[in-house]
Amino acid sequence: MTTLLISDLHLDEERPDIARAFLRFLKERASQAEALYILGDFFEAWIGDDAMTSFQRDIAAALREVAERGTRVFLMHGNRDFLVGHSFCRQAGCTLLRDPSRVILNGAPVLLMHGDTLCTRDIAYMRFRRRLRNPVSVWLLRHLPLSKRRQLARKWRDASRMQVRRKATEIVDVTPEEVPRIMAAHGVLTLIHGHTHRPAVHELQVDGRQARRIVLGDWNRQGWVLQVDGSGYHLTPFPID
């Protein structure tokens, strides 16, 4: 049994190379897996299921094809695509996951997250996130005119890129104390997340026990996938082209 986990593809029409790599990944690897987990920022931006482009519909159709072959597909919101809704998931044949979600991999409980809520030292972002992800705010955003939603998406994307460049490295990375706290709260010794674009496997202690935090990589010059199978956890890059 093989489970694949990816995140931070930031799919966008301006990066057809990443889209081609993802479609190839679905055909060559995901279609052979028992499950595929996509842990947020699947799309560079998402302004609502009612505004899907032909590019996004093609991605949904490709996911559905994999799901119909027997691979269970799970999707978690990221900070760029938190407006993805159930309509897209129905078209894509995938299940929308809560953040965080506790699942069983290789017979052991594992916590899955996008990862932005672990960056608690970024106080300005956390405050902005709480306002934006409030159910009332989400409802209002989904009911704004499409032109206004497109304008806001461009504004937030540009602001996010600027802030990442300006902020200190430790602020936009996870807060070290937050990791064991949330792992202990959910009773797990393995945490898997994306968001930071810093792929690595970190060893730590949780309540005096050996634990690990696996950070998925973003897809840019290369792609990243975490494969979980009978031999363990394997985080590996692969070429985009």
Curated annotation (Swiss-Prot):
Q: What is its EC number?
A: 3.6.1.54
Which pathway does it serve?
Glycolipid biosynthesis; lipid IV(A) biosynthesis; lipid IV(A) from (3R)-3-hydroxytetradecanoyl-[acyl-carrier-protein] and UDP-N-acetyl-alpha-D-glucosamine: step 4/6
Indicate which residues the UniProt annotation says bind substrate.
N79, R80, D122, S160, K167, H195
Q: How does it sit in the membrane?
A: Peripheral membrane protein
Cysteine disulfide partners in this protein: none
Keywords linked to the UniProt accession? Cell inner membrane, Cell membrane, Hydrolase, Lipid A biosynthesis, Lipid biosynthesis, Lipid metabolism, Manganese, Membrane, Metal-binding
Q: Which GO terms describe its biological process?
A: lipid A biosynthetic process
What start-end ranges are recorded for coiled-coil regions in this protein? none
NCBIfam families on file: lipid_A_lpxH, PRK05340.1
Q: What does this protein do?
A: Hydrolyzes the pyrophosphate bond of UDP-2,3-diacylglucosamine to yield 2,3-diacylglucosamine 1-phosphate (lipid X) and UMP by catalyzing the attack of water at the alpha-P atom. Involved in the biosynthesis of lipid A, a phosphorylated glycolipid that anchors the lipopolysaccharide to the outer membrane of the cell.
Q: What is the name of this protein?
A: UDP-2,3-diacylglucosamine hydrolase
- Origin species, per record, is Azotobacter vinelandii (strain DJ / ATCC BAA-1303)
